[in-house]
């Protein structure tokens, strides 16, 4: 965005010509799982993946340090405050935004997974945990960073922006 602003004095993002650029509070970025897919139907796998995502690093790299962490699939708008208040006990109990790779590893081990010779988590049959993220183009800044975090923790992850992503997601033809 800075390059565009340098070259075009008429260009203006939502927040003006000074960072942060864009609408940082519009809606939280989320990773969605198809819970009917093998491995993703196991809550411990989903929890492990959650623990492998370092949200501070994601914000630093994908959003140039501008953004807010959220553990809920909705922004912290004033009209939703009562909902956030009602969820506070659950958030404290489960800590859904906690970055803790050791906890992720422990959850997978407890669920019967081990790392194979390639360092990828696999079940007793040798089937690896795969998280091929399909996404809309406007998540191209964060998707590859999440993929790298997952790979570093033994999840076989990838990122793509297929032209029919809406159809894939609506039809349940995706994993992550």
Please identify what each model-predicted range represents.
Residues 32, 132, 156-160:
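Structured core elements
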Residues 114-116, 152-167:
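Short, well-structured beta-strand/strand-turn elements
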Residues 41-148:
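Append "and occasionally in soluble cytosolic enzymes with long acidic Gly/Pro-rich linkers
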Residues 1-37, 48, 56, 60-62, ...:
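Extracellular/periplasmic solute-recognition and catalytic clefts
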Residues 2, 90-99, 144-148, 159-161, ...:
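Extracytoplasmic/cell-surface-exposed regions of Actinobacterial cell-envelope-associated
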